[in-house]
Design a protein with these regions (language model features):
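Two-component system phosphorelay core
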Residues: 1-116
Length: 116
């Protein structure tokens, strides 16, 4: 696994590996689950539909997943979005989606490259 590729996408591979007690196989399995997870699509759909509760649930789930995988850039963005949603600042939370989408796409691309 090329940690430089991951680091460029805001993923601390060393920290993630430490969380997995050094098991690269476990980390790879969880990275694959991240790629298959539907919460980003659910977040986008909920925002489009104005479903605030659904958006909060999806964003909060993504925050936890990214935290567990040491996806620091995404974790920070989702944390901010969840905080805004909980504070009732829906417009600002929605405005974060472009930045979140770019960081998410970077992370997906990096993980895919490392799993090839």
């Amino acid at each position: 696994m090329d940690s430089r590729i991951l680091m460029d996408a805001g993923i601390d591979a060393e920290s993630a590996l430490n969380r997995m007690m050094g098991s690269e196989a476990l980390l790879e399995r969880l990275f694959r689950r991240f790629l298959e997870d539907g919460n980003f699509s659910a977040l986008s759909a909920a925002i489009e539909a104005g479903d605030r509760e659904g958006a909060l649930t999806a964003s909060h789930t993504l925050k936890g997943m990214c935290g567990n995988l040491s996806m620091d850039r995404l974790y920070s963005l989702f944390s901010g979005q969840v905080d805004l949603m909980r504070a009732g600042d829906w417009e600002e939370a929605v405005n974060m989606m472009q930045q979140i989408r770019e960081a998410y796409e970077d992370a997906v691309s990096a993980v895919k490259r490392c799993l090839e």
